[in-house]
Amino acid sequence: MEVVAVDIGGTNARFAIAEVADGRVVSLGETSMQKTADHASLQTAWQAFAASLDRPMPRAAAIAVASPVGGELIKLTNNPWIIRPALIKERLEVDEYVLINDFGAVGHAAAQLPEDYFLHLCGPDTPFTKQGMLTVCGPGTGLGVAQILCTPDGYHVIETEGGHIDFAPLDAIEDNLLKRLRKTYNRVSTERIVAGPAIVAIYETLAEIEGRAVQRLDDKAIWLMALEGKDSLALAALDRFCLSLGAVAGDLALAQGAKGVIIAGGLGLRLKDHLARSGFSERFAAKGRFRTMMEAIPVKLITHPQPGLFGAAAAFAQEHAR
């Protein structure tokens, strides 16, 4: 059957028509992007997508949102839209739907995508286990964390708030970074260190350590300089970011008993060329007495361009295969 997959973030809402069968995604059509600022609600963005098609809309929806999905009213993060689940069928003119957290959708994508969509980062270059736990984590605007429990009968995605565990500094530079962040936040979570906006605090901490006066820049400007190799301090901040991502991914894998780790998130693909040559793998494995165990865990980067859309469709497929 066909389903309209929707991935709603703070800036954009992405739409695509997916075909699902037997609990899995068969295909995902071309992506259409609607800016959330151009629409008062999901309903009007949905109608704009429908108007762009030369065919009727499927009467099923798979919707991923940047917010917890429980309750009668869903307020999206960094987005003024409000979604009332009880009104979705009426407002969108669908017969059935699935509503899922956006990183839960990434978990479903990771569970269903072929191995071709994963880039090996460290650990053994082997396929993921078909039985046991996989950890999924991904830096974007925040730090998303999910688990995938693989069984002989399929899989189950467990949504978590693992991005909000406490940050643990591992060297003097990170001690300084933590001290800086504590001036603003009483409690410093890993999301303050391993998410897109965190690059600002890392950059400014390094500048302070080196005694350099730097212009106040936003995270987008620093990321651009770092990824284009235009500024040595921005590059150093990027290296530091990768170190922290490796440490956090390793902590999560250790805590969750993971047999594999998947890196995703809005920054994942942008870091593709940098992670492998940074200190990510060393920090991931550096867990004291458990180093040997950590070195045996395959760590891969998800490379699908639209894991949120694919995962929303996958969640619908799994739900309606029962």
Per-region residue spans from a language model:
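A glycine- and small-aliphatic-rich helix-loop capping segment at beta-alpha/alpha-beta transitions
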Residues: 20-24, 78-82, 113-121, 150-158, ...
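Short, acidic Gly/Pro/Ser/Thr-rich loop/turn segments
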Residues: 13, 68-70, 142-146, 201, ...
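ATP-dependent carbohydrate kinase catalytic cores
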Residues: 96-128, 220-232, 236-239
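Short beta-strand-loop/turn "lid" adjacent to the catalytic site in phosphate-handling enzymes
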Residues: 53-99, 104-117, 268-273
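Active-site nucleophile and cofactor-binding loops and adjacent substrate-binding regions
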Residues: 34-36, 76-79, 98-105, 125-127, ...
